[in-house]
């Protein structure tokens, strides 16, 4: 009984020790009653996170029955039993103090990284002497102390009941292993499920973005073969990878990969290594009893959010970064795709436009000439230019071009545009409708022409409504018989003529297909309220005339350029645009009449005409017919239409500027007219551009300012220098500055010079043209070419109607001679003509500006009408007195016209006046030479006699003699060397002949 009681006492002491050790983090601390057997308690460390210590092997709680069966020694039987139990426990502890771990039982990486290890009390801390001590029996951490106490008490009862030795019940090793296996399996299954769910929920980051490392944690995913297969399949479908641990020490990091196959291989390799690592850790945790305590909670129980440092928080953080990167990449890809789609659409649009252009070209060739001509007449612009709308359908070619014969712009083509844009099937029907709307007024105009031409052929010159032959004389009766308005009897019997008068669509520009010269066919309808009505201007007899539409200012420059390209595309298209209403001219000019609609200018809507200053009566709305101009010595009688009893003045009347006179005539009515509102002096196709048409534009709004006020303003404003290539010549007076808003004065920089060095010469200052004197007295090549373009555009217009029919026939014959190349002066004169008739190529002695020995040939084909000259020059806004002075300087024909040289020099003088220079008293001959057709300047420089010429000649002779002696010596030396060489050669030849003879003799012997 004593042995049994000692064992029970030892078991109770062990139970108390286990309870005490569990309260201090499961560290076994022995409570030895003697001081030498007390276990040293290690100092508690402060780990950064829960650390899993390596558990001890469970100790079997057994009671040595052999001690009880053996007879107790004398003395203290309890002491001997306790000593035996202590020795047995020490032996087992020594075996456990140095365990041999297998590779599978390697501690996890978190234990090594944290730098902490499981500190167990070693046997060295315990004294060797165990006598007189009661050993503390170790109990498993998982075995409750109450179970051991209950087992001990039950054994004591049974032993006391049966009065015999009964072995103490022991907790079986199989039971403990089963409990540990179940607990470890549950923890591993939960960890595997959570890790698999996290990896599947991870977003797929882009290949170009590095994923952030997942934070180190003890929660490592345990992946099976099925999970690895599913994850690999997910990686293939998404073509991306997830960041997973690739090494047991640190998580792996996938970088940038260009090949998707390489990405798949790396991901599969990382998943396999992670699975191996997780399996090793799980195998170790199977034997651990602290696994469930050291697992971090994934979700915080307080906030419901992912716990910091957990795998889920790191995964969510990496997923958010990856998702934002994916959004940016997707937006960039969408922008690139959108840009590619836009480029593709533009390319398709260009291809469609090219196909439409080809179709339009075929359509142009297939359409008849009248259809094309009326298209150009009623739609001033490139009507064949089609554009592609937003829907990819062709827009109506007439869109943007309002027909002139309608009151509302575009009224006839609204339905046509709807059909073109709405339904492609109605294109042919809409084009037929528009063609009918165009052909209807054309047929009415043709009928009007026929009705007008029929009575003209049947009636004589006395009954003709617009006679030409009786208008040769300028008596009052001839002028009074002319119909000047629609209410007069001359036009009352012709309704078609009245309709033509009311129609403002006139043929503006006519171009001859046999000559590059352009002419003016429409002139301003001037005020007819005054007593002195302007004369009628007869048509221009140009053979093979073809229409060229003149673009208005409202059209854009792109339309003008496109129209110019269209007209210059091919000669066949140019010839196909013959105007059906152009007059057919016979040999006799008396029958060459023109319809009034071709003479009357076209008024532009929205621009008010400036009223005349001298005319007090209101302007009449009815147009005025002009009469043909007669050839005379001056331009005064021909332009005013007054009787011939007026004194002959040298300067034309339209340059006098008498705005206050009652009988102002053409000068008073035209003094304040807009410069280029009606006259279209610039053709769309010709390379010769109008000089003043672009530079001196008319004001945007109507005003009552006179030309003199504008001229005074022009004197004060700065001007621009002539630029090469036909660019801007003078600053626009009406657009740049007005009297209401004068230009600001130049701002002076002031201050002292920063350097005393001489500054380099600057370029030409266009605000101070008087400081530039180079080439100021002659025309430059650029100026001459520019003025030649204006002259070629307007030469020969209205000039033949100065002559009588016989003179006109002579002019036609001479023009044929020009075409055939007969340019002899004898062909220009006509000996059979009367003395009164003047040939178109008349020898005229020059005026005071040219020497008496010079002869100028006046060719009417090259002359420019004085009326056109006045319209051109008045666009410069110079005073009429100044323009009259320029006319007197350049007028060499004295017949109301200017020849080529006079016109070019006059334009140059107008430009010089705009620069601020004064007019010369007479034109320098060098200026006339610079505008000649054969402008070849040969400069002959005469050498002046120099001093000491005799000495220089003597020295020159000595030098020549010395050189001659040296040359002689060189020649002699060369001859001597040559002779020596010849002698040596002869000697060698003689020796060779001698040897040959000797050999021959020896052979014969």
Swiss-Prot record:
Q: Where is the composition biased (Low complexity)?
A: 1-18, 76-86, 127-161, 568-578, 608-624
InterPro entries assigned to the protein according to its UniProt record, in alphabetical order: EF-hand-dom_pair (IPR011992), EH_dom (IPR000261)
Classification via Gene3D superfamilies? EF-hand
Report residue spans for region: Disordered.
Answer: 1-170, 183-219, 239-258, 272-350, 402-587, 602-624, 657-682, 735-776, 942-1005
Q: Which cysteines are joined by disulfide bonds?
A: none
Instruction: Could you list this entry's UniProt keywords, alphabetically sorted.
Output: Lipid metabolism
In this chain, composition skew of type Basic and acidic residues spans 408-419, 763-776, 961-1005
Record GO cellular component, one term: plasma membrane
Q: Where is the composition biased (Basic residues)?
A: 948-960
Gene Ontology BP terms: endocytosis; endosomal transport; lipid metabolic process
What CDD domains does the record tag this protein with? Answer: EH (cd00052)
* Ranges of biased composition (kind: Acidic residues): 246-258
- The EH domain covers 845-934
- Role this protein plays: Positive regulator of phosphatidylinositol 4,5-bisphosphate turnover and negatively regulates signaling through the cell integrity pathway. Involved in rDNA silencing.
For this chain, the family text in UniProt reads: Belongs to the IRS4 family.
User: What name does this protein carry?
Assistant: Increased rDNA silencing protein 4
Q: Which organism is it from?
A: Yarrowia lipolytica (strain CLIB 122 / E 150)
């Amino acid at each position: 009984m004593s042995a049994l009681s000692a064992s029970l006492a030892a078991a109770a002491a062990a139970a108390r020790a286990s309870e005490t050790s569990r309260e201090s983090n499961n560290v076994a601390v022995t409570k030895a009653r003697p001081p030498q057997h007390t276990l040293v308690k290690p100092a508690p460390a402060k780990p950064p996170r829960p650390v899993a210590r390596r558990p001890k092997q469970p100790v079997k709680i057994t009671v040595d029955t052999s001690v009880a069966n053996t007879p107790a020694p004398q003395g203290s039987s309890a002491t001997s039993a306790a000593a035996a139990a202590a020795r047995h426990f020490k032996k087992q502890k020594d075996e456990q103090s140095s365990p041999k771990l297998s590779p599978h039982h390697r501690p996890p990486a978190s234990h090594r990284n944290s730098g902490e290890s499981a500190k167990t009390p070693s046997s060295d801390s315990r004294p060797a002497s165990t006598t007189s001590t009661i050993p503390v029996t170790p109990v498993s951490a998982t075995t409750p102390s109450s179970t051991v106490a209950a087992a001990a008490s039950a054994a004591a009862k049974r032993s006391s009941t049966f009065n015999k030795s009964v072995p103490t019940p022991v907790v079986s090793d199989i039971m403990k292993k089963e409990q540990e296996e179940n607990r470890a399996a549950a923890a591993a299954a939960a960890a595997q499920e959570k890790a698999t769910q996290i990896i599947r929920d991870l977003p797929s980051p882009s290949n170009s973005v590095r994923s952030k490392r997942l934070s180190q944690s003890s929660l490592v995913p345990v992946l099976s073969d099925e999970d690895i297969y599913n994850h690999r399949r997910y990686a293939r479908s998404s073509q991306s990878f997830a960041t997973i641990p690739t090494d047991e020490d640190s998580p792996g990091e996938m970088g940038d990969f260009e090949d998707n196959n390489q990405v798949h291989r790396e991901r599969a390799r990382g998943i396999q290594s992670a699975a191996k690592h997780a399996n090793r850790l799980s195998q170790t945790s199977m034997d651990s009893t602290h696994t469930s305590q050291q697992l971090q909670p994934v979700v915080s129980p307080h906030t419901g959010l992912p716990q910091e440092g957990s795998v889920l928080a790191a995964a969510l953080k990496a997923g958010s970064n990856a998702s934002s990167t994916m959004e940016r990449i997707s937006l960039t890809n969408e922008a690139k795709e959108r840009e590619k789609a836009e480029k593709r659409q533009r390319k398709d649009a260009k291809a469609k436009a090219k196909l439409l252009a080809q179709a339009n070209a075929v359509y142009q060739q297939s359409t008849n000439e009248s259809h094309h001509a009326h298209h150009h007449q009623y739609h001033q612009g490139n009507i064949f230019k089609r554009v592609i709308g937003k829907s990819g359908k062709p827009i109506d070619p007439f869109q943007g071009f309002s027909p002139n014969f309608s009151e509302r712009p575009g009224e006839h083509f609204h339905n046509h545009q709807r059909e073109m844009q709405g339904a492609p099937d109605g294109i042919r029907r809409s084009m037929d409708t528009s063609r009918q709307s165009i052909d209807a007024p054309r047929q009415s105009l043709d009928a009007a022409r026929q009705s007008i031409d029929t009575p003209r052929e049947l009636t004589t010159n006395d009954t003709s409504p617009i006679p030409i032959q009786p208008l040769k004389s300028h008596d009052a009766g001839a002028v009074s018989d002319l119909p000047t308005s629609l209410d007069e009897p001359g036009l009352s019997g012709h309704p078609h003529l009245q309709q033509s008068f009311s129609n403002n669509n006139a043929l503006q520009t006519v171009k001859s297909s046999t000559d590059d010269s352009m002419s003016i066919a429409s002139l301003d309808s001037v005020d007819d309220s005054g007593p002195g009505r302007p004369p009628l201007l007869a048509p221009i007899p140009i053979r093979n005339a073809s229409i060229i539409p003149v673009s208005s200012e409202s059209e854009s420059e792109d339309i003008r350029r496109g129209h110019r390209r269209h007209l210059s595309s091919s000669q066949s298209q140019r010839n196909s645009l013959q105007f059906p209403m152009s007059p057919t001219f016979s040999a006799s000019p008396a029958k060459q009449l023109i319809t009034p609609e071709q003479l009357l200018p076209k008024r532009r809507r929205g621009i008010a005409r400036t009223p005349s200053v001298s005319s007090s009566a209101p302007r009449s709305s009815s147009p005025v017919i002009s009469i043909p101009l007669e050839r005379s010595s001056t331009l005064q009688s021909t332009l005013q239409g007054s009787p011939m009893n007026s004194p002959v003045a040298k300067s034309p009347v339209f340059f006098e500027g008498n705005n206050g006179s009652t009988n102002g005539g053409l000068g008073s009515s035209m003094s304040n007219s807009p410069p280029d509102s009606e006259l279209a002096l610039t053709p769309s196709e010709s390379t010769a551009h109008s000089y003043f048409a672009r530079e001196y534009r008319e004001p945007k709004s109507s005003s009552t300012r006179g030309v003199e006020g504008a001229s005074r303003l022009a004197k004060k404003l700065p001007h621009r220098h002539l630029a090469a290539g036909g660019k801007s010549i003078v600053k626009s007076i009406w657009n740049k500055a007005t009297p209401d808003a004068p230009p600001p004065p130049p701002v002076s920089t002031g201050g002292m010079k920063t350097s005393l060095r001489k500054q380099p010469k600057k370029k030409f200052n266009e605000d101070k043209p008087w400081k530039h004197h180079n080439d100021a007295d002659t025309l430059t090549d650029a100026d001459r070419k520019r003025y030649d373009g204006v002259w070629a555009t307007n030469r020969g217009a209205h000039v033949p109607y100065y002559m009588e029919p016989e003179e006109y026939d002579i002019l036609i014959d001479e023009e044929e001679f020009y075409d055939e190349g007969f340019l002899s002066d004898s062909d220009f004169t006509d000996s059979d003509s009367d003395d009164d008739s003047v040939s178109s190529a008349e020898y005229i002695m020059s005026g005071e500006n040219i020497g008496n020995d010079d002869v100028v040939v006046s060719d009417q084909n090259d002359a420019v009408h004085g009326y056109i000259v006045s319209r051109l020059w008045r666009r410069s806004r110079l005073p009429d007195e100044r323009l009259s002075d320029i006319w007197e300087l350049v007028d060499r024909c004295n017949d109301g016209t200017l020849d080529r040289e006079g016109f070019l020099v006059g334009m140059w003088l107008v430009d010089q006046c705009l620069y601020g220079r004064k007019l010369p008293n007479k034109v320098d001959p060098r200026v006339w030479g610079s505008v000649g057709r054969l402008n070849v300047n040969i400069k002959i420089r005469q050498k002046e006699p120099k001093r000491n010429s005799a000495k220089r000649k003597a020295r020159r002779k000595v030098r020549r003699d010395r050189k001659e002696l040296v040359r002689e010596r060189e020649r002699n030396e060369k001859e001597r060397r040559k002779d020596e060489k010849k002698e040596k050669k002869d000697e060698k030849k003689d020796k060779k002949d001698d040897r040959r003879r000797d050999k021959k003799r020896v052979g014969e012997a």
